[in-house]
Amino acid sequence: GIDTTDSVFNFIRGQISHKKQIGKVRSSETYRSMLNSFTYFRKGVDLTFDMMDGVLVELYEAWMRKCGLARNSTSFYMRILRTNYKLAVEKGLTPDRHPFRNVYCGIDKTVKRSLPFSEVKRINGLDLSRKPSMDFARDMFMFSFCTRGMSFIDMAYLKKTDLNNGCLTYRRKKTGQLMTIEWTKQMQDIIDKYKPNGTSFLLPIITREDGNERRQYQNQMRKINRILKDIANQAGLPLSLSCLLYTSPSPRDRTRS
């Protein structure tokens, strides 16, 4: 087999170590997650960068889709693999064969209505420290925003075990699609703000596992939607924010931050 420092697996392992050394722990975890996925696809067989061509990369994408990953999730792994490939090209390990030409590396805009980033900033900047229920509603809105517009029902049913290796992986209740999202500091800050609940759920939306989980989710949703209207008023926004827990803000706007 191939066992050189220039092999794809070893090169990415080197990048993981480098990211840890410079303090980019989350980034190193997402690289690790992609490497695990790619190694699994390759059945553990390493390769050199000049063996990577369009056919191989397309097969990897097709394999991920077959495993149930949605387009935004396959694209998330593809972007990491492409970054490593470009770095290998820069280091002279392979000529650029443009193997990513025919695979999807973008972010789908999963939106009907979206909020400009400047307005999200206004919501995030409100001082709600003396209004815990408004603060909580705003945090849930921001969590949805950070996760590219995750719906409230998917947020409510997220499990602690869905968070692994710097990635959040969950199934959409509505479509059954498997989603993978990079876990960020802002998401972690929201979780850290609330004391750990004794349930298997990640967010404190459902707080008791007593058979009434659905009712708890529905009550919380009604309450949060009501409060989001007040938050929109306070931020001087013309539209209700409650619709935005069902539709996602624009990732294109987000990248301007």
Language-model segments: residues:
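Basic, Lys/Arg- and aromatic-enriched nucleic-acid-binding interface segment
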Residues: 98-152
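Single conserved hydrophobic/aromatic residue that forms the stacking wall/gate
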Residues: 246-257
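Short, contiguous acidic/charged loop-to-helix segments that flank catalytic cores in large enzymes
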Residues: 128-132, 169-179, 211-220, 238-242
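C-terminal catalytic core of Y-nucleophile DNA break-rejoin enzymes
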Residues: 175-193, 200-230
